[in-house]
Amino acid sequence: MSEAEKKATIASGAEAAAPVAAQPPADSTAVVADASTIAVSTETAQEKAGKDETPAPIAAIAEPAASEAAAAPEESAPAAAAVVPKEPAAASEETKAPAAETAATPAPAAATSAAPEATKEKDAADAPAAAEKTGVAKLWEVCQAHEHKEIWGVTLQDPSSDVPTEIVLTKFLNANDGDVPKAVDQLTKTLDWRNKMKPLELLKKSFSRAKFGGLGYVTNHSEAADSKDPALKEVFTWNIYGNVKSMEETFGDLQQFIEWRVALMELALQELNIAGASAPHTITAENDPYKIYQVHDYKSISFLRQPASVKAASKETISVFSTVYPELLKEKFFVNVPVVMGFMYGLMKLFVAPKTLKKFHPMSDGGALAREFGGSKVKTLGDAMPKEYGGKGEELKATGKETMLD
């Protein structure tokens, strides 16, 4: 073989051995079709989560969630291609000893080079924490510049020393998957809205008993009454739309309905008590116990020919809540719903993130609700549910809190 042929053969072998660059995965964002009907699942929420499936789309006649703002789903980075080196040829008996002596010589240099590598690993591990601190610090600058100084009952202070403020600002970051500019925009809109709406004052406002009596409740269930661990407490909001006496009366005045619904949410936030949080009970994107269960009961509700006022109230409430109450929904249960529903899910898709839709669980049988809470650290939670929802507790009228009514 000529010298040129040898070089060509070597080049060809090297090209074949080169690692192939990993291709980025295809976009895995779930595409939800515009369906006018859905099948209500009989599986529990935990069984659905185990299958890693997006629940069937659902619809409701009124506000379905205090949900997170829409955020792009996380994408997994492609794994780097690895090349497995060929094993070196076995050394002869005559050459083994000299090779060992030669290898022993540069050992100190190898030990020295380990230090920079360890430093790099530490820097890489610290990078996410540093980025999070930078994001919280940026959001704190927004709070300092704004005239309104409160969110969800928390008086905003320096998050480096105030745990409640750190929790609030971290929720805005988490709702936007760490995207600081988006979090800044949502936080600014929330501060503007709270400054105008004054939701804490709505807690002192009396609403019409004829319109809203028996329509909304807040319950608080604790594993230990004196525990400061937020994971040992579960807060619920209940919307009993079957108790609506007149659709037009309840939903016809849009501003009044929104005010009542906001007052109920703020009542739940008082029970959640983020303002009372203290170290070490902070939050991360993966671990956040400061969230609320929501239950909407549609027993005896007809989903045919809903008035325009109901649809308008639904659309406005979803839009408002998805902006100003991010990362506060734990899971949402639609109980006693008909098998076929329609218009509401189309509205949800416009405002609610896909990761939030996965928290929605339609159920045709309200009596099965108590079985959904086996994963809660409040071990008695299922039994604490009212009897009509499969538990052993008293009815909501006896145990739940309502907004002020006259």
Swiss-Prot record:
Tell me which stretches of the chain form a coiled coil. Answer: none
In what way does this protein cross or attach to the membrane?
Peripheral membrane protein
Domain (CRAL-TRIO) ranges: 216-397
Example of a GO cellular component annotation carried by this entry: plasma membrane
Task: Tell me which domain of life the UniProt entry assigns to the organism this sequence originates from.
Answer: Eukaryota
Q: Which cofactor does it need?
A: heme b
The UniProt annotation places heme binding at: Y241, R261, H296, Y298, K332
User: What PROSITE patterns does this protein map onto?
Assistant: CRAL_TRIO
Subcellular localization is given as: Cytoplasm; Endoplasmic reticulum membrane; Microsome membrane
Which reaction is catalysed here?
a 1,2-diacyl-sn-glycero-3-phospho-(1D-myo-inositol)(in) = a 1,2-diacyl-sn-glycero-3-phospho-(1D-myo-inositol)(out)
What keywords would UniProt list here? Cytoplasm, Endoplasmic reticulum, Heme, Iron, Lipid transport, Membrane, Metal-binding, Microsome, Transport
**Where does this protein have compositionally biased stretches of type Basic and acidic residues?**
45-54
GO process terms (BP):
Golgi to plasma membrane protein transport; phospholipid transport; regulation of exocytosis
Positions of region (Disordered)? 1-130
Compositionally biased, Low complexity: which spans?
A: 11-26, 55-117
Gene Ontology terms, MF aspect = metal ion binding; phosphatidylinositol transfer activity
General function of this protein: Non-classical phosphatidylinositol (PtdIns) transfer protein (PITP), which exhibits PtdIns-binding/transfer activity in the absence of detectable PtdCho-binding/transfer activity. Regulates PtdIns(4,5)P2 homeostasis at the plasma membrane. Heme-binding protein that may play a role in organic oxidant-induced stress responses.
State the family it belongs to. Answer: Belongs to the SFH5 family.
**What name has this protein been given in UniProt?**
Phosphatidylinositol transfer protein SFH5
Which lineage do the record's taxonomy fields give for this organism? Eukaryota, Fungi, Dikarya, Ascomycota, Pezizomycotina
